[in-house]
Amino acid sequence: MMLITTSHRPTRRTRSFGHDLERVFPNSLYMTRGKKTIQELLMEAYDRGYERLLIINVWKGNPLKMTFIKVHPDDWGYLGYLYLHGVKLQREMGFRGLNPIREDMPLVVTTAKRVGLDHLAFAQVFSELTTGKFVPRGDKSLLSIADKYNTDVLAVIERHPRGIVVNFYRLDVTKERAVGPLINVKIWIMEDGRRWDYKEAFGIKVKPRRKEGEAEEGARKDSH
């Protein structure tokens, strides 16, 4: 499925997030970045038979951005980006030491039962980014969807006051609740031009940034 790594000099929390993703993306691997360049990571992913390279970027100690790159020797390219409000790790949801899934099974991407068009659109985008299988939820239970597609792992797109969240289920671990990680997405951008921003979607006004000259003038006035 994918090779998962981080930007250079990741924090412990970011490494933990990478390991958590390894446990919910079937047949995937988390690898310490070290000094590897993007090209070296792409070759590593290609040699291992992966279709995607995922790089987790850090800001102030926390995962900030997930960059998805298509793996192909002649046609590699950036696919899209998720900008995050934050994440909740598996250990913070009560699950420690889960084993990665080392067998072929699809990652099924679906939604909670009552969501809006934004959630449906993002579910399709997330399946494209991860090579997962998008399945419209309707009135079906997660168990029935998993049985139909012969999988133990589902990514469920859910509502959140500050954006959209992705929550992961491992039915081989528990059928009662999500195991995580929980990913809170505030912005997603695809290279083909599709995008979504929670502030725009929720009608939140963003204060315009002052131009450099205006900022300097304001600073001079404040100093008097």
From Swiss-Prot:
Listed GO MF terms: rRNA primary transcript binding
Cited function: Probably involved in the biogenesis of the ribosome.
Enumerate the PANTHER family for this protein.
U3 SMALL NUCLEOLAR RIBONUCLEOPROTEIN PROTEIN IMP4
Q: Where is the Brix domain?
A: 1-196
Zinc listed as a keyword = no
The protein's matches in SUPFAM superfamilies, at most eight in alphabetical order, are given as: Class II aaRS ABD-related
Kindly give the NCBIfam families that the UniProt entry links to this protein.
Answer: PRK03972.1 (NF003053)
Biological processes, Gene Ontology terms: rRNA processing
InterPro entries documented for this protein: Brix, Brix_dom_Rbsml_bgen_prot, IMP4/RPF1
Per its record, how is this protein called by name?
A: Probable Brix domain-containing ribosomal biogenesis protein
| Phylogenetic classification of the source organism | Archaea, Methanobacteriati, Methanobacteriota, Thermococci, Thermococcales
- Keyword Transmembrane present in the record's keywords: the answer is no
Question: Which UniProt keywords are listed?
Answer: Ribosome biogenesis
